[in-house]
Structure formats: C-alpha cells, structure tokens
C-alpha cells in the first residue's frame, strides 16, 4: 500500500507565476517552456504563421522540437525536449474522442523524432489552463516533480520526497491525493482536477519506457492510466530526472475551446453520439469489447501474430476472442478516458489477483488489454490464458514499459530459445518456452529491478539480434530475419507478409513500424479494398494524411475508424469515408 503524502512533504525548489488566459477559437496562442535543469518556466508566443502551417498537436510538437534541437542532438542530451501538444479541438466535450494529446521527442530507440498519441485528462487540463503545448527541456540534478496549477496560476518545482513510490499505479495515486490540496485527498471533485504524467522504474533500465497519463475514476475511487507508448519517451523523462509532471484544472465546460459556432459543434457531435449508440452493437462492439474485438477477426484471416509473427493463426485463437474479453471487462462502469466520449472503449478488468512479482496476491484494476497488448503478449508468445495477458499488461503499465515492444521482443527471445540460441545459463534460469507467461513476467520483473537477464532483454530486438550473433555465434542473417523492428522500434501486432500495403505502412514511415499512420491491414486483407498496386500506393498517401489530421486536431481516430455510417457501403469509394471493417462481423464465427 502507498502512504499518504501531503504537500509539506515536498521540498519546494522554485516557483514561477503566470497570468491565466482564456482559449479563443481553439487556441491560447502561447506555449509553456519548462527547463527542469534551470528550474524555470517561460511563456512562448504562437505566431499566426505557426498556427496556419502546423495547426496543433503533432504539428506543434514537431515544430517546437525542431526549434529546440540541432542535427547532432541525441535523445539523452539536455536540449532534447518532450513536447506535449494539444490541437484546437482537444477537450471539446461535445465531440466523442476529443481528449487526445500528442507527445513528441527524440526517441532512444530510433534516434529520430517520435510522436505518440495518448488519452486521459492531462492534455485537456493543460489546454484549458491557457496553453497550446508544454515543452520539457534540460536535466534536473535531483529527482524533480513539476506542478502546473492552472487554477491558481503558477508552476512549482519540487524535490521528490523519500519514500515516494516508483510504480505507476501507486505513484499516480500518491501524487493525485497530495496535489489535490490539504484536506482534499478524499474529495472526488478535487481528485478529478488532477492529472499526472509519470514513467515507471522500468524506464530507468530500458529504451522502451512509456509515459503514463493518469485520470481519477470517480466510480472506482482510483487511478487509471493511458499510455503514450511508442518510441521510449518515458525513458527520456526518467533520463531528465523528472519523477512526474502534475497538472491541476477545474471548470471544464461544453465550449471551453471557444468554438466559433458552438451550436454547430453541438449539433454535429450529437449526430455522431447517436450513430455510435445506434451502430456500435451491430458493428465492432467497441463500447463492450474495445479494440480487443479484433482478436478473432485477425485470427480468422491469418493476420494474428503467433509465435513471433511466424504464423497468423492458431486453433486456440477462440480462447482469446472478443467475447472472452467482454466477459472479463467491467461492463457496469463507464470507461471513457475523457468526458463526453460515447465510445467509452478504454475498458478495464477490476479485482484481478496478481500471481507474480512484488504485488503477488493483491487485487488490482488492469487497464485493458487493448488489441495490441492481447496480441503482443498473448498469441505472439503463444499465451492463450487471459490471466497471463492481464498480468503482463498490468506490470508493463506500472513499470512503464511499452506492451508492443515488450511483446515483440519477448517473442523474439522465445524463438531464440526454441532455436537453441538461448539456454538456461544465458537467461539466468528463466524458461522461455512458448506459452510460458510466467517466464515472460520474470523478465519484466528483472528489467524493472535492473538486474539479471531482464537488463539485457530490455535493450530491444535490434540490439539483441546483433548481440546474439556476435556473442553467442548465432547466424547473423537468421537473427536479422526474426528480429521484427525498423530503425530499432519493434513492429506492432499485425502479420503483414501478404499485405504490401501494410508493409509499406510499417516500413515507409519516418518514425518506425507502428500502426498509427497507415493502418491498412484491414482495408487490404479483410475487406479487399486495395486490389491493385495503384490502389495500395494511393492508400499509403491518403490514409496517413487523414490519420495525421486527427493528431493535429486533438481527436481520437477510433470514433471514425470503428463506426461507419449505416449507409456507407452505398457510396463510391466507401473505404475513403470509412475503412468499412464492420461488415466483416457477419463472416466471423461467434460462440453458440
């Protein structure tokens, strides 16, 4: 259990006050620059040219990172920044999925800029406090907590007190209750006004570190987290000796973005809310299953990564099907990661009893799994026990490790075990046979502790494939063939062997093989909307352009991606309105 902290337990290092500012037509026209080494905060203006060219979100993040760095800047240099940027629509409660912010930095995995989108309350709270972006730069000399109070109008730098937890599910709870204010540690309204960015202790020992963005769940009286997961930005945060960034804000309203035509926004938002409610149960069932609804579809179409992406299907696939997760998810609690989202697809499993690690025997709330996690640490490792997936999901989150990179990396290790490249002597006794999720969990615990085989494993598949060839005499070409990464970033969880469109979606991207920009696997392989080379090439242009638009505006892609208008199929080029995957539900087996 975590202890109760009060603000008096935190040593104040510095404070800067600022004038609060209202949003006008989606913009505050300023960003906040924080130098944790100098313990300073300054406002930076946003020019009309910057707004016109870069819009917000990912665009602002990349522009600010460009201005802050030099060609020779490396990820662990003080001048590298972590930029959290919101678009003009971010936080608008009329529209489903408006809670997204984009995080940009130089990646410790690839060495080049990475961006990762994330839900939760932090981005909207920062936005409505009068900021279009936050820049974190420099390196602190002590473990530091940055507190942005958008209610009172100040930024404070605190030294992290002794005894503060390192693991996210406890740390975020301690900080939320401490910064809610004296005597307010049990007041739901005050607790809900706090959001925390942190990275767990696993990020100290691996380039796979994620940023956890917290939200206080009133119904559960507890903390939940969403991740900016790809590219290792949590590792950058820990390298800067930032224990956490805390924001406080009150007063979210229907028109906090100051839309030019709030009536039109409300009308269009209501239309989308209605379409989600009417169509979701007949299509992807996101409101009950979340992205885990993809599991049996991917297995049916030979696209579900199995045994380190060697196969795309297995007879045990139904053991991880969507209806399995629907029964495990808590259906009686709202699961949106921001106010006003009818999709509410951020499901959780409550009261899950852990079987391994430092919290063995404790019952916890597990955020997820999302499809990428269920596939990555499930079928990809030949793990078909939901409890194993939930265990790995929880510990990846609380240790601050990306589930996609961890799943792809562990799949590589298990294949190396099968090939005889790895032995008990080389893994410190850990059995990495296919399906042994407790062996995978031991790697994760050791990684978090910075010891034994976990430290080596945590370096990622690019390093491991080269290391096994040079140190263990493994066949270098074979190691390269089975190490699924691009530029050092592990591939996400779709079999792309027969999909040229998805291969391009993975390996023509600037930031490495992720599914954010060009998620074409469904359009290409399930619904057969891209029958020619020309169609695939065209999709590799328009699809990432449209997906990037969401990242500029502050919107989640899923209300568009997973709900199609009922009459969508009647229109020409329906795939350009919606990817149209819901139609496949009739072709997928369902339990009797």
Residue ranges and their predicted role:
Residues 98-100, 176, 180-197, 201-587:
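Extended C-terminal regions of large enzymes
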Residues 2-230, 234, 239-254, 259-280, ...:
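Protein-protein interaction/assembly regions in multi-subunit complexes
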Residues 588-592:
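Hydrophobic alpha-helical segments, chiefly the membrane-spanning helices
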């Amino acid at each position: 259990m975590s202890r109760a902290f009060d603000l008096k337990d935190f040593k104040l290092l510095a404070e800067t006050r600022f004038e609060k500012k209202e949003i006008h037509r989606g913009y505050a026209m300023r960003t906040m620059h924080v130098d944790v080494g100098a313990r300073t905060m300054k406002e930076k203006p946003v020019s009309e040219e910057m707004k016109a060219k870069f819009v917000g979100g990912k665009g602002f993040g990349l522009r600010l990172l460009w201005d802050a760095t030099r060609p020779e800047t490396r990820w662990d240099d003080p001048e590298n920044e972590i930029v959290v940027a919101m678009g003009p629509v971010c936080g608008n409660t009329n529209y489903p999925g408006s809670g997204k912010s984009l995080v940009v930095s130089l990646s410790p995995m690839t060495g080049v800029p990475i961006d990762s989108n994330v839900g939760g309350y932090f981005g909207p709270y920062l936005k409505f406090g009068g900021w279009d972006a936050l820049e974190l730069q420099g390196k602190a000399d002590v473990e530091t907590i940055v507190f942005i109070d958008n209610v009172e109008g100040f930024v404070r730098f605190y030294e992290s007190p002794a005894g503060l937890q390192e693991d996210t599910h406890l740390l975020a709870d301690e900080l939320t209750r401490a910064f809610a204010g004296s005597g307010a540690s049990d007041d739901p309204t005050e607790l809900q006004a706090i959001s925390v960015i942190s990275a767990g202790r696993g990020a100290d020992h691996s380039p796979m570190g994620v940023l956890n963005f917290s939200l206080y769940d009133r119904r559960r009286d507890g903390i939940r987290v969403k991740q900016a997961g790809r590219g290792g930005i949590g590792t950058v945060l820990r390298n800067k000796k930032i224990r956490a960034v805390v924001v406080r804000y009150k007063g979210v309203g229907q028109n906090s973005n100051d839309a030019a035509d709030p009536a039109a926004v409300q009308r269009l938002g209501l239309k989308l809310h209605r379409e989600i409610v009417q169509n979701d149960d007949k299509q992807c069932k996101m409101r009950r299953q979340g992205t885990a609804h993809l599991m049996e579809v991917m297995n049916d179409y030979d696209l579900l990564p199995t045994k380190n992406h060697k196969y795309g299907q297995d007879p045990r696939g139904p053991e991880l099907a969507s209806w399995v997760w629907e029964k495990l998810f808590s259906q009686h609690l709202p699961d949106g990661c921001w106010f006003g989202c009818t999709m509410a697809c951020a499901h959780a499993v409550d009261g899950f009893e852990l079987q391994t690690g430092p919290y063995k025997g404790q019952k916890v709330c597990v955020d997820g799994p999302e499809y990428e996690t269920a596939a990555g640490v499930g079928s990809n490792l030949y793990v078909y026990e939901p409890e194993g997936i939930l265990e790995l999901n929880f510990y990846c989150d609380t240790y601050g490790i990306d589930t996609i990179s961890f799943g792809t990396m562990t799949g590589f290790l298990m294949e190396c075990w099968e090939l005889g490249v790895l032995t008990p002597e080389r893994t410190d006794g850990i059995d990495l046979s296919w399906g042994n999720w407790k062996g995978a969990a031991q790697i994760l615990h050791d990684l978090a502790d910075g010891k034994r085989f976990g430290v080596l494993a945590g370096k990622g598949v690019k390093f491991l494939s080269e290391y096994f060839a040079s140190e263990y005499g493994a066949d270098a070409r074979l190691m390269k063939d089975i190490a699924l990464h691009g530029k050092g970033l592990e591939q996400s969880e779709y079999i792309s062997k027969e999909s040229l469109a998805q291969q391009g979606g993975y390996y023509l991207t600037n930031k490495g093989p992720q599914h954010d920009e060009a998620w074409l696997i469904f359009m290409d392989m399930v619904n057969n909307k891209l029958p020619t080379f020309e169609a695939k090439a065209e999709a590799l242009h328009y699809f990432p352009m449209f997906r990037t638009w969401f990242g500029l505006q502050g919107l989640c892609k899923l209300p568009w991606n997973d709900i199609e208008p009922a009459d969508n199929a009647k229109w020409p080029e329906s795939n350009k309105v919606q990817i149209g995957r819901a139609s496949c539900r009739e072709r997928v087996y369902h339990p009797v």
